[in-house]
Amino acid sequence: SFEGSQGSGTAALELTLDIPLLHARDTKVKGIVTLEENVLAMPWPVPPVTDLTGRVTFTEKGAWAERVTAKAFSRDATLNMHTEEDGTISLAFSGLAQPRSVSYFNNNPILAEALTHVKGETSYVGAVSISPATGVSVSVQSDLKGVSTDLPSPLNKSAGSVWPLTFAFSNAGSGKTARHRIAVNVARNRFSGIVEVPAEGSRVSPRGSFAVGRRTYLPRSGFALEITGKTLDADRWQTAGEALIAAAKKLAVTGDTEGGATLERVSVDLEE
């Protein structure tokens, strides 16, 4: 649903109501909202959009839209929307984004440090599902063309090279064990990361793992940093690794979670 959303701007509404005199609960609704450079802020994790322009049709059962244009993360985007039979709202979108936009979903110190070595912007396609049963999920794919890095091998990338990226945000658990899960994979495990953070009201501790040169998995607790490779530049990776480890040490948290989240494991594996 759009509960908790806030919007502003100029819009035109066409509305038709069919209200049975003896059965008002069976009222039928049909309408069209024409948006012109509107602003829409939905609850996290859906990013806010500006310059929202296009037509949205709706009934008592849901909403639909095609080729609505907007700006997300200050870059052009296009979206389509439809409502499933079970009430799930599905958004399909595409556009341009800068890598640092990922930090909107989780401003993890390790991820933030890694993103300081990345510049440029790239095209993407993605989907948002807003389900009455499972909440909000987000998935994004990109080839990262247009993005470059100044990290050591195997994470040194030129702007013209193609590195497939997948990003996923989902929910797990409920009540005091409810948590958000964020997973990123770049160029088939050149870099991978997975993080779980507590949802509002949850008492679970954050945990996660980031890996270079291999696929990573959620640890039982705390955070892990793994670097694997056949030909690692020891000097350059020492500098980069020290910065990542320093960032990881900022992960200690306070609050209502059970315990804290700290860097529990660092491994470097030079493959033969």
Q: In which residue ranges do the predicted regions lie?
A:
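Central antiparallel beta-sheet cores of small beta-barrel/beta-sandwich binding domains
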Residues: 186-188
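Membrane-proximal interfacial segments on either side of biological membranes
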Residues: 1-71, 75-181, 194-272
